[in-house]
Amino acid sequence: MSALVVAENVSRTFVRGASPVHALRGVSLELNAGELVALVGRSGSGKTTLLNIVGGLDRPDEGEVIIDGRKLNQLSEAARQRLRREQVGFVFQSFGLLPFLSVRENVGVPLRMLRWRTRAREARVTELLATVGLSDHAEHRPPELSGGQQQRVAIARALAPSPHLLLADEPTGQLDSETGQQVIALLQRLVHDSGSAALVATHDPALVSFADRVLYLRDGALVGDPSA
């Protein structure tokens, strides 16, 4: 099987004061279509930095990332932005919804940015809201929803343009245990059904059971299972 996403020897260093901070140290990984991979590590281990680089939001100091055969370091900034909008979906711990827009409008935001025609956009949004179980909440605004419902909206929005890659950074961090497991189970089902690849960063070991594979990150480097 040819990997959908490849990261090769990725390193990233930040300078804070007079001291360099090695956020990532020679990280290599592959993500396959239809696969949900958990990225497990403590706060500060480099999870968010790795997601930002894999998603094209940041550039590595060394190494490269390849998405669907395209090397990100060879793309212009405009091409990288286009790739992010069309092929990468992001889900964040804080949901990132626009409070003054309805649920329907929030899910449709990335499709408006890609200039989808109105009829196609509305059909896609309706389909996604049914998929995540929020058809009855289409005209609600985010503040009227529970945390779990808001994260379902965020997942629907991330999947709106049918991206090849889904990146989720602590998507259950603001949810209670039961709701978090429901959200991850939904994410798992959607990834398997859509054929996208997903990389989910978490510090919660309880979510590992929903992953097809688990990667452990410690001090910016991938390591074996620390509990083994």
PLM features: what roles do these ranges have?
Residues M1-S2, A228:
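Short, low-complexity, intrinsically disordered N-terminal peptides in bacterial proteins
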Residues L4-F210, V214-L217:
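ABC family nucleotide-binding domain
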Residues Q74, D225-A228:
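Short amphipathic beta-strand/extended segments with alternating polar/hydrophobic composition
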Residues V214-P226:
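H-loop (His-switch) and adjacent beta-strand-loop-beta switch element
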